[in-house]
Amino acid sequence: MCGIVGYIGTNNAKGILLEGLEKLEYRGYDSAGIALQNKELVTVVKEKGRIADLASLVPSDAFGTTGIGHTRWATHGKPNHENAHPHQSKSGRFTIVHNGVIENYTLLKEEYLKNHSFVSDTDTEVIVQLIELFAAELSTKEAFKKALSLLHGSYAICLIDQTNTETLYAAKNKSPLLIGKGENFNVIASDAMAVLKETDEFVEIMDKEIVIVTKDGFTLETLEGEEITRASYKAELDASDIEKGTYPHYMLKEIDEQPAVTRKIIQAYQDEAGEINVDKTIIDEILSSDRIHIVACGTSYHAGLVGKNLIEKMAKIPVEVHVSSEFAYNLPLMSKKPLFIFITQSGETADSRQCLVKVKELGYRTLTLTNVPGSTLDREADHSMYLYAGPEIAVASTKAYTAQISVLAVLAVSLGREIGDEEALNINLAAELGIVATAMEAMVSSKEVIEHIAGEYLATSRNAFFLGRNIDYFVAMEAALKLKEISYIQAEGFASGELKHGTIALIEDGTPVLALITQESINWNIRGNVNEVLARGAKTCIFAMENVAQPGDRFVIPQVHPLLTPLASVIPCQLLAYYAALHRDCDVDKPRNLAKSVTVE
């Protein structure tokens, strides 16, 4: 949610900021703005809408060798020009951009700024007015630090001072921010992807640290004034990794990348003997626990449900799955030695991070599954396993979901082998995941079939239902989430046996009902449920795996191992959502109101 780019150097910052903000569009936003500092003149341009709208408003001759940019996802105040960032202090001396939520901003207004008039409804404007207030008696750095010391909540901040054209200031707490190093310039960004074109060398900023940046270098300090030395690291990404190439949308590109991601996971976790294995310290840690708690949000939560099924079957350890935003405020009854697995694509999800902090305070051990090495949850967990999915730019997650399930399968089989589980010992997971990758390739080559189904069933529908049983139910929930995210159809996934306990009342003539069937043991049970809604006027569609497919099924899913069926059955569901969104003329990669990386609670 939201994104920050800052630049200080010798070149014009305008293009660097606008291009950087474009690279951060995936994070979700409703308005955007930049500030350019040329000597002692600061030009601010901001507006509700897309980066393209902002770029059209920036004067062609706008110039500044120092600048800050921001994409905003509204938390305080409506999405409009006044609430868009950057914000300026009353005199115009200070200009600021901010990600996060300041929980005590109304109290700070009352205590320090009672006589100030405010242009916006944001918490951010309070910060910049405080800095100006304190700067009447303190240096900019000390005024900044004093303001930061009063803030309760999360923030990533970038600040420029009209009276000091040679310096950029930044700070963070519970919201991602990093420094990019260059020759005769330095950059600040929420995500390395924003500035990969400028540099591939980065330094992390940790919580409650500030950084004073010039074109020649930077100084890291704690709020107490202690200087910090921290090594830089090279980004593993290349600028080409985050381009669409010949694809019309990132989402379609990322759906197509899933076979390659699956094979990359095989390689990453395969030992010299060709066996799939997980670090022994992780295995021992998990097997010494008496209960596993998986904590995740959204798509990652759905992957966690599949993970529960796999781990309980293989490792014989009870597993509970929790929604992050609920877990932190309603801790379950704890066993004697629980272990917590956090699943997060970005590694920055605020709700999940809050849960991780809480369980670590209680002394429990933690494991993070993330796609971003070096992210907050990666750094703060006791152990990490990586997804190897590469950058996922589209807001709706596709390849990260299948990567999460693949890595959970790797973990489950490794645990099962360690305890001598017969099924785990007998499965050649590398080979079976290879079969999954081949099945994925076959399905992404059948796009025209799914496009036709999407047009027939969903182009004009107001709602849709997905049905499944057992492991197919978990995929039905994910399929419904994908559809509602990008096509704005009210879609829900249900355990098909629960239809007659209430949901069937919503079925009327023409209601689209899509059923997923991959398990022989429950094939006819689900088909019976499909007949129940068909008898009440529903327009039904069945996606079935080869071993259970019947004449009349609309799409046949290639056969894969029974434990890995979600990896295959979700592919046509992702494509269905994609083409439904196209038929409805929706913004596939940047759906309204949504953010890729949810960094506020």
From Swiss-Prot:
One of its GO terms (biological process) is fructose 6-phosphate metabolic process. This is Glutamine--fructose-6-phosphate aminotransferase [isomerizing]. It catalyses: D-fructose 6-phosphate + L-glutamine = D-glucosamine 6-phosphate + L-glutamate. It is an enzyme of class 2 (transferase). Residues 2-216 form the Glutamine amidotransferase type-2 domain. Gene3D superfamilies: Glucose-6-phosphate isomerase like protein, domain 1, Glutamine Phosphoribosylpyrophosphate, subunit 1, domain 1. It comes from Listeria monocytogenes serovar 1/2a (strain ATCC BAA-679 / EGD-e). Keywords: Aminotransferase, Cytoplasm, Glutamine amidotransferase, Repeat, Transferase.
